[in-house]
Curated annotation (Swiss-Prot):
It comes from Alteromonas mediterranea (strain DSM 17117 / CIP 110805 / LMG 28347 / Deep ecotype). GO terms for biological process: translation. Keywords: Ribonucleoprotein, Ribosomal protein, RNA-binding, rRNA-binding. Part of the 50S ribosomal subunit. One of two assembly initiator proteins, it binds directly to the 5'-end of the 23S rRNA, where it nucleates assembly of the 50S subunit. The gene is rplX. Coiled coil: none annotated. This is Large ribosomal subunit protein uL24. One of its GO terms (molecular function) is rRNA binding. GO terms for cellular component: ribonucleoprotein complex; ribosome.
Amino acid sequence: MANKIRRDDEVVVLAGKDKGKQGKVLRVLIADNRVIVEGVNLVKKHTKPNPQLGVAGGIVEKEASIHVSNVAIVNPATGKADRVGFRFEDEKKVRFFKSNGELV
């Protein structure tokens, strides 16, 4: 299946503990069908100090991945979640918003 959400897209979370939050996609994990969204689904990770790498130990908050079905791309024209489709323009495959037909 083609990936409808890509890095740097603005998305909104549709389900889960962070439902309604918006953020920018930092990374797309294609093999797992998951995305990492900036400031959403934060988890606390306990890290050991590593003097060789210059890493101090402690508790670090970082973003965990969210399944791609639980996020939707935000249409900048409406500011709301929207569905995305594909079509060909000038022999190039482009993404468009299903509500108004504008290109992503």
